[in-house]
Amino acid sequence: MQQTIQTTLLIIGGGPGGYVAAIRAGQLGIPTVLVEGQALGGTCLNIGCIPSKALIHVAEQFHQASRFTEPSPLGISVASPRLDIGQSVAWKDGIVDRLTTGVAALLKKHGVKVVHGWAKVLDGKQVEVDGQRIQCEHLLLATGSSSVELPMLPLGGPVISSTEALAPKALPQHLVVVGGGYIGLELGIAYRKLGAQVSVVEARERILPTYDSELTAPVAESLKKLGIALHLGHSVEGYENGCLLANDGKGGQLRLEADRVLVAVGRRPRTKGFNLECLDLKMNGAAIAIDERCQTSMHNVWAIGDVAGEPMLAHRAMAQGEMVAEIIAGKARRFEPAAIAAVCFTDPEVVVVGKTPEQASQQGLDCIVAQFPFAANGRAMSLESKSGFVRVVARRDNHLILGWQAVGVAVSELSTAFAQSLEMGACLEDVAGTIHAHPTLGEAVQEAALRALGHALHI
């Protein structure tokens, strides 16, 4: 029997939430052990956020190169480009390797002991990993989430999840994406730009159903221009003889020949396989219930990130992980962000931060809503990307900004400014009175605020 490891903080899960909590705990001098059954970095770093953005970049570069085989207003002409998808995947893997190696180095630098293996929780103070017992004062659950599977579309062979989609050995002729949310559309657009025929099957009547139709309209238009077929209001029935079967709810059946089917219908908290049942924690649906300090219903047992429910975002998990480490160190902290940015890396990109016009209305708030189109922004024109807009939502009485939304090229990079303005309690006058560099996409942020005040300059 191996000697029991004693520690103050034991973290299960080395994803963004878990490793950030460990790094901060190490900085604060808290003895910390991190247990991870797979590669450090979790879903985000290995099979999610980072590799998907790398593949999206490859797809965009190939798509742009392919455009220039025909006459271009930019005056650029090239021969037909060729794609080595194996080399593309290797480049993507190299980025992942560098980042995961960096995480390991940071953990070592701050004195965090990393134990590789799957944790089995014995009680709120003890965990076992491959026969090694670890005893702790604080247990932090950061086990993440997993892809939702459909019983009529079991994974295997031509039916894949986002994990397999991010490491293709060859491109399919026809990829059918089941799910019109952000994961399905991000990958579907990437595959289309890489040269595959792509169809999207969505049970609801529109794409990106968690966003309002005004925001998603430019994305729908882009999908049409790219030649991606949308089959909305269709429920999947199965896959047989090389065809995806779906019905439209009116008695009609859809048959789509497909050599690859990507199931992208969401994610669920990962609570199985760790013996968490022994803790008898209070649940919030499929997620572990937490309070404003990320504490569960059991004293000194904490939960952060996807396992604690929506919004399932890496930056939320990171912020929670940092906070929990500081609470354990004795600092007074609460997780009460003014807003958490949600970003969809489609073409064009979509960003939502804070309250939308509909949410403000539902809460009985009297608001000013104003938007500024990228068609009137010089930088957007120079990027050949005039579609989309920036929209601001602010209280009518005191002009306090409650929310920002944007759709357009590279608007993901505006998300920080949006979140910061809400966190700092900015009013329309604060943003409108800030000199924005010219020419930048950020000028549309200032112009939206100016328009809300009744005097936009460039429209």
Swiss-Prot record:
Swiss-Prot/TrEMBL cofactor(s): FAD
If you read the UniProt record, what top EC class would you report for this enzyme, in one word? oxidoreductase
- The active site annotation covers 438 (proton acceptor)
- Provide the residue positions that the database annotates as binding FAD: 36-44, 53, 119, 142, 182, 306, 314
Q: What is the reaction catalyzed?
A: N(6)-[(R)-dihydrolipoyl]-L-lysyl-[protein] + NAD(+) = N(6)-[(R)-lipoyl]-L-lysyl-[protein] + NADH + H(+)
The disulfide bonds in this chain are 44-49
What would be one Gene Ontology cellular-component term for the protein? cytoplasm
* Cofactor comment text: Binds 1 FAD per subunit.
The job of this chain, per UniProt, is described as: The branched-chain alpha-keto dehydrogenase complex catalyzes the overall conversion of alpha-keto acids to acyl-CoA and CO(2). It contains multiple copies of 3 enzymatic components: branched-chain alpha-keto acid decarboxylase (E1), lipoamide acyltransferase (E2) and lipoamide dehydrogenase (E3).
The UniProt similarity line reads:
Belongs to the class-I pyridine nucleotide-disulfide oxidoreductase family.
| Additional observations | The active site is a redox-active disulfide bond.
State the name under which the record lists this protein.
Dihydrolipoyl dehydrogenase
